[in-house]
Amino acid sequence: MGSKKKKWILSIVAVIILISVVSALYVYSKLESVKKVPISKDDKELKIDKKAEPYGDDVINIAFFGLDRRKKEEPSRSDAVMILSLDKKHKKVKLSSIMRDSYVDIEGHGKTKLNHAYAYGGPELAIKTINSNFKLNIRDFVAVDFYGLENIIDTVGGVEIPVRSDEIKYINSYMQGTAKVENKVIQEVQNPGLQNLNGMQAVAYARIRYTSGGDYERTERQRTVLTAIMNKIKKLGPTEFPKVVSSLLPNVESSLSSTEIMKMGTSAFALGMDNVEQQRFPLDNYCEGKLIDGIYYLLFNEEKTINQMHKYIFEDIKPN
């Protein structure tokens, strides 16, 4: 190989390395724009159950909350409650939804709906509630409100969603309400089928609860949208990625530090984002809706649900 060719190859490699380093530094600097919300680091305070505590680091569970609010500072119920599980042993990424109407015990407030925990005491109480009622080991969270989610989706260029004919009228109806608040013009969804939805359309899709599947299908739609965002981010090129990161992160709140977010993101992509496994809890046949004092709650078989959730999240991993 001639010296000129060697120099040319070395120059190309040097440029690639430089771009990679600059991109990494840029992304890291933008991580500081995430709103850091400190929560307790004490396992006892977070109600980490002894049944889940010994699993070690084979599976990392992070709570994800989709918040129903219009102003950053106002108290909000968690319209979506999910657990993102990074399973290092089986090299899987799993996304679990917990029904928001689940009838659970919330510290200081007695038995009520799961999604009230965030409004009563923010992310820390919400994490405590999940851990204590489902015997889990969640120590951190990520949260985004629906307006932030809309911005994120628009930044990645929309997401591909399979829209059914019975969902169209609800998508357009939800968008009309959002448009009044945001003073925007809506772009109505016209036809069913797989299509690229913009931020407002995709968020409206995720909020539908009046089709035949009710709230059960709603949780599935929420997971579909979140998974579509993950897949879209993974496919971004090196020139697009910094732009997306700079726009995405200011919409996010988290207990994780910038270093931890980088580490978690790297782990998630390394484990594979193309086929995120999904599940919803409680499972069918182990729960029933019931009116208590005129309010709808979802009652569930606690022992069975805990066992099913652990089997799904931890699989064959045994406590240390």
Segment roles from a protein language model:
Residues 69-73, 112-120, 135-140, 192, ...:
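Second-shell loop/turn segments in exported
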Residues 46-51, 64-70, 77-82, 116-131, ...:
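N-terminal post-signal-peptidase region of extra-cytosolic proteins
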Residues 74-78, 108-109, 117-125, 143-147, ...:
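Soluble non-cytosolic domains of exported or imported proteins
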Residues 57-60, 76-81, 90-98, 109, ...:
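Extracytoplasmic
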Residues 44-52, 71, 102, 253-320:
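C-terminal solvent-exposed extensions
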Residues 154-237, 319:
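Flexible, polar/acidic helix-loop-strand segments at domain edges
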Residues 6-90, 266:
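Entry/capping segment at the start of metal-dependent catalytic domains
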Residues 120-183, 257:
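Amphipathic, coiled-coil-like alpha-helical scaffolding segments used for oligomerization/assembly
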